[in-house]
Amino acid sequence: MSNNKETPEHLQAQNIIVIHPGSLYLRMGRASDVNPCRLLHAIGRRRKPGGRAYRDRVLSVPIAKPKESLSEFEECRLQVSHTLQSCVQSDGRRRYATPPQQISAFNRRSGAETVQASRVDWKDDLPGDKVFGEEVLWLNPAGEFNVHYPIRRGELNLHKDVGGSMSGVMCDLQDIWEYVLRHRLRIDLKQLKQYKAVLVISDIYNRAHLKELTSLLLNKIGFGCCFLVQDHVSATFGAGLGYACVVDVGDQKTSISCVEDGISHPNTRVRLPYGGADITQTFHWMLQKCSFPYKECDQSRPQDAFLLKQLKEDICHVNLDVCGAQEKTFAVHQPQQEKRRFTLQIGDEAIVAPLGLFHTELLSVTGVNKSTPMTQKPSRAQPHPEDCFDAEYLRETGRRGKENLEQTANESGMANAENADEDMVVEGLEQDREGKVNEKDFILPGGQMIGIDQAVLQSIERCPNDELKRKMYGCILVVGGGMKFTGISNWLQNRVALKIPLMYRSEHNIVTSSKDIDAEITAWKGAAIMSCLESAAELWLTEAEWTRYGLRILREKAVFMW
């Protein structure tokens, strides 16, 4: 009996590297791997003598909370709490809640218990000028290292401070990715010409950024060839679905689009600038309101930020059968301090915080509730001087061609019948064929951003025909690591089901993790599957093609509408 690991397909998959970069984590692995390597998507760089200090934070800086925001937050929190109290458990009994005063009194009495453990120190004595992975979290804030996260809120982290230029961000990405290739995947970088790369990109993309990323893979890191695939398209492959309304909740953004037969419809795409990290900060705010026993917790410290993230993942849920106060223990081990254990009591705050995805007033702690959503810019709004087939180039050359043609016709005295055709071409290009998607459609009166359930409805309503809308209402795929709360998929299903137009109602189903794949790696797994298909042979873009043709070849070979 032959060994499956020796088949040509498996050998080919071993030479394909699938890269899924996120705002918090990077997932990278061979297409033949069951699971990818997961690494903190950050880098520590030793400052040059006299250089400016700069550190990206794990959690965004909380905004100064004016009275209006606090009252808005508190009003929404009370409204959600009353809604939960009016719900019933699965056995038909009414839910009950422990009074907040009782929970606060317990937490105020809860003291720290010292635990015997080995001492933890700052990692200031690391060799070299670069630090990767979890060690970045243990760099002394007063030390010699700057900390950079190259992706924030799903976009390249471009800013005007240290390391915020395009070249700086590309250098960070190159160093992090090459570190994983060398030290996690054990690949000799000199042999990379024998390897292919698949890069999972955001469903809403910037064409100039894609050019830089393709150059990074082929020219700088040195892969033999590559192709790019949108995360929502690869998620449907990973879940084994031919179509779905994909809801991807990451650490710092939530993106939604409708995918059918490997195509993400541009008009249905929207990215909301909130995710799991915003839920973490909302949860911390609620913990403070009920006398969180770890009083010196500071979101700006990486260790405390990850502690809060872990508490959110361990405690938060949307299980209506869990009522009253729950006791949880957690440990705190700061550098150069003793390890301490705390006991925490918490009530419905564990449910209210995740529901911030539906009631964005609860996210006012970070200010994202008043941010502007992002939709896909049409190609005419993203002209590039190297792309001789984009709308801007054709518009300009078409106009010049028309002027030259008119001049020739006038000189010869001939009636130019071709001018009518030329006019049609130019005017057709000047129209926005992709339709207009207004970001304001995702903002409620008063500037409040809509919740995830309303965003799903808005996205599906932008589908081009009724049949596609009906299919999307029947298949909503939830992926990403920011919405992994028990029971939240049922909550989303119920919220959406109440608002589905009668003509589209059918058997309603939300797929959370099809084929037993973790929602966090569904998109990565789908890209790995795509790369091994026979049809993928036409997608690969070689370094020679890229160097010769540039953006033209990406336009021709891209698996998405350029």
From Swiss-Prot:
Location in or out of the cell: Nucleus
Domain of life: Eukaryota
Binding site for ATP: D248, V249, G250, D251
Any one of the GO CC terms: nucleus
Any Pfam family the entry gives: Actin
Family affiliation: Belongs to the actin family. ARP8 subfamily.
Listed name of the protein: Actin-related protein 8
Organism field: Aedes aegypti (Yellowfever mosquito)
Lineage, broadest ranks: Eukaryota, Metazoa, Ecdysozoa, Arthropoda, Hexapoda
